[in-house]
Protein backbone atom coordinates (compact mmCIF):
# COMPACT_ATOMS: atom_id res chain seq x y z
CA UNK A 1 0.00 0.00 0.00
CA UNK A 2 1.62 3.27 -1.10
CA UNK A 3 1.71 6.08 1.40
CA UNK A 4 2.03 9.65 0.20
CA UNK A 5 1.68 11.66 3.40
CA UNK A 6 4.54 13.12 5.40
CA UNK A 7 4.17 12.62 9.11
CA UNK A 8 4.99 14.99 11.90
CA UNK A 9 4.31 13.49 15.29
CA UNK A 10 4.30 14.91 18.74
CA UNK A 11 4.66 12.42 21.55
CA UNK A 12 3.16 13.96 24.63
CA UNK A 13 3.40 12.25 27.96
CA UNK A 14 3.35 14.12 31.21
CA UNK A 15 2.85 11.79 34.12
CA UNK A 16 2.45 12.10 37.84
CA UNK A 17 5.05 10.71 40.22
CA UNK A 18 5.77 11.36 43.83
CA UNK A 19 8.95 13.38 44.05
CA UNK A 20 11.76 11.44 45.55
CA UNK A 21 15.46 11.78 46.09
CA UNK A 22 17.54 9.03 44.55
CA UNK A 23 18.79 7.63 47.81
CA UNK A 24 17.08 7.26 51.18
CA UNK A 25 16.88 10.46 53.18
CA UNK A 26 15.68 10.67 56.73
CA UNK A 27 13.65 13.53 58.16
CA UNK A 28 16.72 15.36 59.49
CA UNK A 29 17.12 18.70 57.72
CA UNK A 30 20.83 19.01 58.51
CA UNK A 31 22.50 19.68 55.16
CA UNK A 32 25.58 17.66 56.09
CA UNK A 33 23.44 14.56 56.50
CA UNK A 34 22.34 14.88 52.86
CA UNK A 35 25.80 14.96 51.33
CA UNK A 36 27.41 11.94 49.65
CA UNK A 37 31.02 11.55 48.55
CA UNK A 38 33.11 9.35 46.27
CA UNK A 39 33.90 7.11 49.20
CA UNK A 40 30.54 6.95 51.00
CA UNK A 41 27.94 6.81 48.25
CA UNK A 42 26.66 3.37 47.34
CA UNK A 43 23.95 2.74 44.77
CA UNK A 44 20.81 1.05 45.94
CA UNK A 45 19.01 -1.68 44.11
CA UNK A 46 15.86 0.37 44.46
CA UNK A 47 12.51 -0.08 42.77
CA UNK A 48 9.60 2.25 42.17
CA UNK A 49 7.82 1.20 45.34
CA UNK A 50 10.75 2.17 47.55
CA UNK A 51 10.89 5.46 45.65
CA UNK A 52 7.24 6.09 46.43
CA UNK A 53 7.85 5.42 50.12
CA UNK A 54 10.71 7.92 50.21
CA UNK A 55 8.51 10.42 48.41
CA UNK A 56 5.99 10.24 51.19
CA UNK A 57 8.57 11.88 53.46
CA UNK A 58 9.40 14.77 51.14
CA UNK A 59 5.87 15.42 49.88
CA UNK A 60 3.44 14.18 52.55
CA UNK A 61 0.61 16.37 51.30
CA UNK A 62 -0.73 16.69 47.77
CA UNK A 63 -0.95 20.35 46.81
CA UNK A 64 -4.46 21.13 45.51
CA UNK A 65 -4.68 21.93 41.82
CA UNK A 66 -4.96 25.68 41.35
CA UNK A 67 -5.39 28.22 38.58
CA UNK A 68 -1.97 29.58 39.50
CA UNK A 69 -0.36 26.19 38.92
CA UNK A 70 -2.29 25.74 35.68
CA UNK A 71 -0.97 29.09 34.43
CA UNK A 72 2.52 27.96 35.40
CA UNK A 73 2.13 24.77 33.33
CA UNK A 74 1.07 26.82 30.31
CA UNK A 75 4.35 28.73 30.59
CA UNK A 76 6.30 25.48 31.00
CA UNK A 77 4.62 24.29 27.81
CA UNK A 78 5.62 27.46 25.96
CA UNK A 79 9.23 27.04 27.05
CA UNK A 80 9.09 23.40 25.97
CA UNK A 81 8.12 24.36 22.42
CA UNK A 82 10.79 27.06 22.35
CA UNK A 83 13.66 24.84 23.50
CA UNK A 84 12.59 21.88 21.34
CA UNK A 85 12.48 23.93 18.15
CA UNK A 86 15.66 25.83 19.07
CA UNK A 87 17.55 22.55 19.36
CA UNK A 88 15.84 21.52 16.14
CA UNK A 89 16.26 18.23 14.36
CA UNK A 90 19.42 16.66 13.06
CA UNK A 91 19.37 16.02 9.33
CA UNK A 92 20.48 12.40 9.36
CA UNK A 93 18.75 10.81 12.35
CA UNK A 94 15.69 10.73 14.56
CA UNK A 95 15.88 13.26 17.38
CA UNK A 96 14.56 13.33 20.93
CA UNK A 97 14.63 16.36 23.20
CA UNK A 98 13.39 16.41 26.80
CA UNK A 99 12.05 19.91 27.50
CA UNK A 100 11.19 18.86 31.05
CA UNK A 101 14.78 17.86 31.79
CA UNK A 102 16.18 21.12 30.38
CA UNK A 103 13.58 23.13 32.30
CA UNK A 104 14.47 21.43 35.59
CA UNK A 105 18.23 21.85 35.15
CA UNK A 106 17.93 25.51 34.18
CA UNK A 107 15.48 26.14 37.03
CA UNK A 108 18.07 24.81 39.47
CA UNK A 109 20.59 27.17 37.88
CA UNK A 110 18.15 30.05 38.44
CA UNK A 111 17.83 28.99 42.08
CA UNK A 112 21.60 29.19 42.52
CA UNK A 113 22.05 32.40 40.53
CA UNK A 114 21.49 36.02 41.49
CA UNK A 115 21.22 39.41 39.87
CA UNK A 116 21.43 39.62 36.09
CA UNK A 117 22.27 35.93 35.71
CA UNK A 118 19.08 34.83 37.46
CA UNK A 119 17.03 37.37 35.52
CA UNK A 120 18.34 36.12 32.16
CA UNK A 121 17.59 32.50 33.03
CA UNK A 122 14.07 33.34 34.20
CA UNK A 123 13.42 35.38 31.06
CA UNK A 124 14.43 32.39 28.93
CA UNK A 125 12.14 30.11 30.96
CA UNK A 126 9.34 32.67 30.60
CA UNK A 127 8.50 32.81 34.31
CA UNK A 128 9.16 34.96 37.36
CA UNK A 129 11.09 33.74 40.39
CA UNK A 130 7.90 33.94 42.43
CA UNK A 131 6.11 31.68 39.96
CA UNK A 132 9.01 29.23 39.98
CA UNK A 133 9.38 29.06 43.76
CA UNK A 134 5.61 28.75 44.25
CA UNK A 135 5.08 25.89 41.79
CA UNK A 136 8.32 23.90 41.44
CA UNK A 137 7.55 21.46 44.26
CA UNK A 138 4.22 20.53 42.68
CA UNK A 139 5.87 20.08 39.28
CA UNK A 140 8.43 17.77 40.89
CA UNK A 141 5.65 15.90 42.64
CA UNK A 142 3.68 15.36 39.45
CA UNK A 143 6.73 14.14 37.56
CA UNK A 144 7.54 11.33 39.99
CA UNK A 145 4.89 8.64 40.07
CA UNK A 146 4.28 4.96 39.63
CA UNK A 147 2.01 4.49 36.61
CA UNK A 148 -0.94 2.19 36.99
CA UNK A 149 -2.23 0.16 39.91
CA UNK A 150 0.18 -1.84 42.06
CA UNK A 151 0.35 -3.41 45.50
CA UNK A 152 3.10 -4.69 47.78
CA UNK A 153 2.60 -8.25 46.52
CA UNK A 154 3.03 -7.39 42.84
CA UNK A 155 6.15 -5.27 42.45
CA UNK A 156 6.36 -5.99 38.72
CA UNK A 157 3.40 -3.66 38.20
CA UNK A 158 5.45 -0.86 39.77
CA UNK A 159 7.98 -0.98 36.94
CA UNK A 160 5.88 1.44 34.92
CA UNK A 161 6.81 4.86 36.19
CA UNK A 162 7.96 8.39 35.57
CA UNK A 163 10.88 9.85 37.51
CA UNK A 164 12.37 13.32 37.50
CA UNK A 165 15.41 13.33 39.78
CA UNK A 166 17.64 16.33 40.52
CA UNK A 167 21.15 16.31 41.93
CA UNK A 168 23.91 18.73 42.94
CA UNK A 169 27.55 17.71 42.52
CA UNK A 170 30.13 19.86 44.33
CA UNK A 171 33.91 19.80 44.13
CA UNK A 172 35.36 18.60 47.40
CA UNK A 173 36.63 21.67 49.22
CA UNK A 174 34.53 24.17 47.25
CA UNK A 175 33.15 27.11 49.20
CA UNK A 176 29.38 26.66 48.96
CA UNK A 177 26.56 28.09 51.03
CA UNK A 178 24.41 25.78 53.12
CA UNK A 179 21.40 28.02 52.42
CA UNK A 180 21.84 27.37 48.69
CA UNK A 181 22.13 23.63 49.20
CA UNK A 182 19.05 23.72 51.42
CA UNK A 183 17.05 25.49 48.70
CA UNK A 184 17.87 22.73 46.21
CA UNK A 185 17.22 19.85 48.60
CA UNK A 186 13.98 21.36 49.87
CA UNK A 187 12.43 22.76 46.68
CA UNK A 188 13.89 20.37 44.09
CA UNK A 189 14.39 17.31 46.32
CA UNK A 190 17.96 17.27 45.08
CA UNK A 191 20.57 14.69 45.98
CA UNK A 192 23.90 16.23 47.03
CA UNK A 193 27.38 14.87 46.31
CA UNK A 194 30.82 16.19 47.22
CA UNK A 195 33.23 14.86 44.62
CA UNK A 196 36.89 14.96 43.77
CA UNK A 197 36.59 15.83 40.09
CA UNK A 198 40.29 15.03 39.65
CA UNK A 199 39.60 11.46 40.69
CA UNK A 200 39.79 9.00 37.82
CA UNK A 201 36.53 7.30 38.80
CA UNK A 202 34.29 10.38 38.94
CA UNK A 203 32.91 9.92 35.40
CA UNK A 204 32.26 6.26 36.10
CA UNK A 205 30.40 7.18 39.27
CA UNK A 206 28.23 9.80 37.51
CA UNK A 207 27.46 7.31 34.74
CA UNK A 208 26.51 4.71 37.35
CA UNK A 209 24.21 7.21 39.05
CA UNK A 210 22.41 7.94 35.77
CA UNK A 211 22.23 4.26 34.90
CA UNK A 212 20.80 3.50 38.33
CA UNK A 213 18.12 6.19 38.04
CA UNK A 214 17.10 5.05 34.53
CA UNK A 215 17.13 1.32 35.28
CA UNK A 216 20.02 0.76 32.94
CA UNK A 217 18.30 2.39 29.96
CA UNK A 218 20.73 5.33 29.69
CA UNK A 219 24.40 5.36 30.70
CA UNK A 220 26.27 8.27 29.08
CA UNK A 221 29.81 9.35 29.88
CA UNK A 222 29.57 13.09 30.55
CA UNK A 223 33.38 13.43 30.48
CA UNK A 224 33.57 15.97 33.30
CA UNK A 225 36.46 18.39 33.18
CA UNK A 226 38.85 18.41 36.16
CA UNK A 227 38.12 22.14 36.51
CA UNK A 228 34.44 21.45 37.26
CA UNK A 229 33.43 23.15 40.51
CA UNK A 230 29.67 22.48 40.51
CA UNK A 231 27.34 20.35 38.40
CA UNK A 232 23.56 20.66 38.43
CA UNK A 233 21.96 17.58 36.91
CA UNK A 234 18.45 16.42 36.11
CA UNK A 235 17.54 12.86 35.12
CA UNK A 236 14.15 11.94 33.63
CA UNK A 237 13.02 8.34 33.20
CA UNK A 238 9.76 7.01 31.78
CA UNK A 239 8.44 3.49 31.27
CA UNK A 240 4.82 2.82 30.32
CA UNK A 241 2.60 0.19 28.67
CA UNK A 242 -0.28 0.62 26.25
CA UNK A 243 -3.02 -1.05 28.26
CA UNK A 244 -3.92 -2.30 31.73
CA UNK A 245 -2.68 -5.83 31.14
CA UNK A 246 0.58 -4.85 29.48
CA UNK A 247 -0.42 -6.47 26.20
CA UNK A 248 1.40 -5.57 22.99
CA UNK A 249 -0.30 -3.41 20.40
CA UNK A 250 -1.39 -5.36 17.34
CA UNK A 251 0.03 -4.85 13.86
CA UNK A 252 -1.87 -4.01 10.70
CA UNK A 253 -2.61 -6.88 8.33
CA UNK A 254 -1.11 -5.07 5.35
CA UNK A 255 2.22 -3.31 4.97
CA UNK A 256 2.49 0.43 4.45
CA UNK A 257 5.16 2.26 2.48
CA UNK A 258 6.38 4.69 5.13
CA UNK A 259 7.99 7.67 3.41
CA UNK A 260 11.21 8.73 5.10
CA UNK A 261 12.53 12.29 5.17
CA UNK A 262 14.95 11.59 2.31
CA UNK A 263 12.02 10.39 0.13
CA UNK A 264 13.01 6.73 0.40
CA UNK A 265 10.33 4.31 1.54
CA UNK A 266 10.25 1.56 4.14
CA UNK A 267 7.65 -1.15 3.66
CA UNK A 268 6.41 -2.23 7.08
CA UNK A 269 3.39 -3.14 9.14
CA UNK A 270 2.26 -0.42 11.55
CA UNK A 271 0.96 -0.51 15.10
CA UNK A 272 -2.78 -0.17 15.70
CA UNK A 273 -3.60 2.12 18.61
CA UNK A 274 -6.90 2.07 20.45
CA UNK A 275 -9.76 4.36 19.50
CA UNK A 276 -9.85 7.73 21.27
CA UNK A 277 -12.69 10.23 21.27
CA UNK A 278 -12.48 12.92 18.63
CA UNK A 279 -11.85 13.53 14.96
CA UNK A 280 -8.39 14.32 13.55
CA UNK A 281 -7.65 18.03 13.30
CA UNK A 282 -6.84 19.14 9.75
CA UNK A 283 -5.20 22.50 8.96
CA UNK A 284 -3.68 23.95 5.82
CA UNK A 285 -0.22 22.57 6.60
CA UNK A 286 -0.82 19.44 8.67
CA UNK A 287 -3.24 17.04 10.28
CA UNK A 288 -2.92 15.73 13.82
CA UNK A 289 -4.29 13.22 16.29
CA UNK A 290 -3.12 11.25 19.31
CA UNK A 291 -2.92 7.80 20.83
CA UNK A 292 -2.86 7.13 24.57
CA UNK A 293 -1.13 4.77 26.98
CA UNK A 294 -2.57 2.93 29.95
CA UNK A 295 -1.97 5.80 32.38
CA UNK A 296 -2.94 8.64 30.10
CA UNK A 297 0.24 9.63 28.30
CA UNK A 298 -0.63 11.12 24.93
CA UNK A 299 1.42 10.53 21.80
CA UNK A 300 0.32 13.18 19.30
CA UNK A 301 1.27 12.91 15.64
CA UNK A 302 1.53 15.93 13.34
CA UNK A 303 1.43 14.79 9.71
CA UNK A 304 2.38 17.38 7.08
CA UNK A 305 -0.06 17.78 4.21
CA UNK A 306 0.95 17.37 0.59
CA UNK A 307 3.42 20.10 -0.37
CA UNK A 308 4.71 20.59 3.18
CA UNK A 309 7.41 18.85 5.21
CA UNK A 310 8.29 18.42 8.88
CA UNK A 311 10.55 21.45 8.48
CA UNK A 312 7.46 23.57 7.79
CA UNK A 313 5.58 22.48 10.89
CA UNK A 314 8.26 21.90 13.54
CA UNK A 315 7.87 25.35 15.07
CA UNK A 316 6.37 27.02 18.13
CA UNK A 317 3.23 28.15 16.29
CA UNK A 318 2.29 24.55 15.59
CA UNK A 319 3.42 23.06 18.91
CA UNK A 320 1.65 25.78 20.92
CA UNK A 321 -1.59 25.61 18.93
CA UNK A 322 -4.44 24.70 21.31
CA UNK A 323 -7.20 24.17 18.73
CA UNK A 324 -9.53 21.52 20.12
CA UNK A 325 -10.57 18.34 18.38
CA UNK A 326 -14.16 17.95 17.20
CA UNK A 327 -15.79 15.23 19.28
CA UNK A 328 -19.30 15.31 17.86
CA UNK A 329 -21.69 17.24 15.66
CA UNK A 330 -25.44 17.17 15.17
CA UNK A 331 -25.33 13.65 13.75
CA UNK A 332 -22.13 11.87 14.76
CA UNK A 333 -19.90 11.09 17.71
CA UNK A 334 -16.31 10.63 16.47
CA UNK A 335 -13.71 8.04 17.44
CA UNK A 336 -10.24 7.85 15.85
CA UNK A 337 -7.31 5.50 16.23
CA UNK A 338 -3.72 6.11 15.18
CA UNK A 339 -1.94 3.69 12.87
CA UNK A 340 1.74 4.40 13.47
CA UNK A 341 5.23 2.89 13.30
CA UNK A 342 7.55 1.74 16.02
CA UNK A 343 10.46 4.15 16.31
CA UNK A 344 13.45 5.18 18.38
CA UNK A 345 15.17 8.54 18.75
CA UNK A 346 18.06 10.06 20.69
CA UNK A 347 20.21 13.13 21.25
CA UNK A 348 23.65 13.76 22.77
CA UNK A 349 25.17 17.22 22.49
CA UNK A 350 26.29 20.34 24.32
CA UNK A 351 23.40 22.83 24.05
CA UNK A 352 25.33 25.76 25.51
CA UNK A 353 25.27 27.75 22.26
CA UNK A 354 21.55 27.12 21.87
CA UNK A 355 20.91 28.41 25.38
CA UNK A 356 23.01 31.47 24.54
CA UNK A 357 20.87 32.11 21.47
CA UNK A 358 17.80 32.28 23.71
CA UNK A 359 19.16 35.30 25.55
CA UNK A 360 21.40 33.99 28.32
CA UNK A 361 24.81 35.66 28.29
CA UNK A 362 26.19 36.25 31.79
CA UNK A 363 25.92 32.59 32.84
CA UNK A 364 28.77 31.77 30.48
CA UNK A 365 31.26 34.38 31.66
CA UNK A 366 31.77 35.78 35.14
CA UNK A 367 28.25 34.89 36.23
CA UNK A 368 26.51 35.61 39.51
CA UNK A 369 26.00 32.29 41.30
CA UNK A 370 25.93 33.97 44.70
CA UNK A 371 22.98 32.05 46.11
CA UNK A 372 25.17 28.94 46.13
CA UNK A 373 28.78 30.19 46.10
CA UNK A 374 30.79 33.41 46.14
CA UNK A 375 33.58 31.84 44.09
CA UNK A 376 34.07 33.07 40.53
CA UNK A 377 32.40 30.54 38.23
CA UNK A 378 31.05 30.28 34.70
CA UNK A 379 29.04 27.68 32.80
CA UNK A 380 31.36 25.73 30.54
CA UNK A 381 28.92 23.14 29.22
CA UNK A 382 25.25 22.13 29.22
CA UNK A 383 25.09 18.52 28.09
CA UNK A 384 21.73 17.11 27.00
CA UNK A 385 21.45 13.35 26.41
CA UNK A 386 18.26 11.47 25.56
CA UNK A 387 17.01 8.09 24.40
CA UNK A 388 13.42 7.19 23.50
CA UNK A 389 11.85 3.97 22.23
CA UNK A 390 8.23 3.57 21.12
CA UNK A 391 7.47 -0.10 20.52
CA UNK A 392 4.58 -2.52 20.45
CA UNK A 393 5.33 -3.36 24.09
CA UNK A 394 5.13 0.26 25.27
CA UNK A 395 7.23 3.39 25.71
CA UNK A 396 10.56 3.80 27.46
CA UNK A 397 12.59 6.99 27.57
CA UNK A 398 15.31 8.71 29.55
CA UNK A 399 17.06 12.07 29.53
CA UNK A 400 19.92 13.83 31.28
CA UNK A 401 20.67 17.55 31.40
CA UNK A 402 23.88 18.57 33.16
CA UNK A 403 24.82 22.21 33.78
CA UNK A 404 28.56 22.24 34.46
CA UNK A 405 29.95 25.25 36.32
CA UNK A 406 33.70 25.79 36.08
CA UNK A 407 35.92 27.83 38.33
CA UNK A 408 36.38 31.46 37.09
CA UNK A 409 34.55 32.31 34.71
CA UNK A 410 -20.23 21.49 26.62
CA UNK A 411 -23.70 19.38 27.32
CA UNK A 412 -23.77 15.75 26.12
CA UNK A 413 -25.69 14.88 22.95
CA UNK A 414 -27.90 11.83 22.74
CA UNK A 415 -28.54 9.29 20.00
CA UNK A 416 -25.54 10.20 17.90
CA UNK A 417 -24.08 7.85 15.33
CA UNK A 418 -20.62 6.58 16.28
CA UNK A 419 -18.03 7.16 13.54
CA UNK A 420 -14.69 5.35 13.72
CA UNK A 421 -11.70 6.57 11.74
CA UNK A 422 -8.01 5.71 11.33
CA UNK A 423 -5.20 8.26 11.54
CA UNK A 424 -2.27 6.78 9.63
CA UNK A 425 1.26 7.91 10.45
CA UNK A 426 3.03 6.97 7.25
CA UNK A 427 5.85 9.47 6.81
CA UNK A 428 8.60 11.19 8.76
CA UNK A 429 7.14 13.03 11.72
CA UNK A 430 7.62 15.16 14.83
CA UNK A 431 6.58 13.89 18.25
CA UNK A 432 5.95 15.27 21.75
CA UNK A 433 5.48 13.11 24.83
CA UNK A 434 3.55 14.81 27.65
CA UNK A 435 0.70 14.76 30.13
CA UNK A 436 -1.02 17.63 31.95
CA UNK A 437 0.81 20.05 29.63
CA UNK A 438 4.22 18.86 30.82
CA UNK A 439 6.20 17.85 27.71
CA UNK A 440 8.76 15.15 28.51
CA UNK A 441 10.22 14.40 25.09
CA UNK A 442 9.98 16.20 21.75
CA UNK A 443 11.75 15.46 18.49
CA UNK A 444 11.67 14.31 14.89
CA UNK A 445 11.59 10.83 13.34
CA UNK A 446 13.01 10.91 9.82
CA UNK A 447 13.54 7.22 9.18
CA UNK A 448 12.33 3.90 10.52
CA UNK A 449 14.40 0.75 10.42
CA UNK A 450 13.18 -2.82 10.35
Predicted regions span which residues?
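C-terminal motif of bacterial Sec signal peptides marking the signal peptidase cleavage site
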Residues: 18-22
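Detector for small/aliphatic-rich hydrophobic stretches
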Residues: 23-196, 445
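Feature captures eukaryotic membrane-trafficking machinery centered on endolysosomal pathways
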Residues: 94-118, 290, 417-450
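Bacterial N-terminal signal peptides that target proteins for export
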Residues: 1-10
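Non-catalytic interaction/Regulatory regions outside core domains
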Residues: 10, 35-56, 376, 382-389, ...
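Non-catalytic, conformational "gating/processing" segments within enzyme and secreted inhibitor domains
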Residues: 92, 131-306, 327-415
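Hydrophobic helical h-region of N-terminal Sec-dependent signal peptides
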Residues: 11-17
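Short Gly/aromatic-enriched secondary-structure transition segments
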Residues: 121-125, 246-256, 312-320
Amino acid sequence: MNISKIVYAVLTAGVLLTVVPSCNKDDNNDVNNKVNSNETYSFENEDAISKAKIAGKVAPEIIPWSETYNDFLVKVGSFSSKIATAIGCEQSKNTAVSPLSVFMAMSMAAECAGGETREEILNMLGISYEELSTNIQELCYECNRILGYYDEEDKDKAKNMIKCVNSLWIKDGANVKESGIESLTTNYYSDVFKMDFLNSNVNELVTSYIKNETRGFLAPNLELEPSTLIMLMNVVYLKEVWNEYGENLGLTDQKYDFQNYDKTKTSTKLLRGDYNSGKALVTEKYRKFYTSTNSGLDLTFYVPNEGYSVDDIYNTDVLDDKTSYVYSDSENRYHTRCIFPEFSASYDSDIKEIIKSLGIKSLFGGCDFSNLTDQDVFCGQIQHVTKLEVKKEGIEGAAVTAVMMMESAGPAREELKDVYEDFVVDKNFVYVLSRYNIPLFTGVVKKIEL
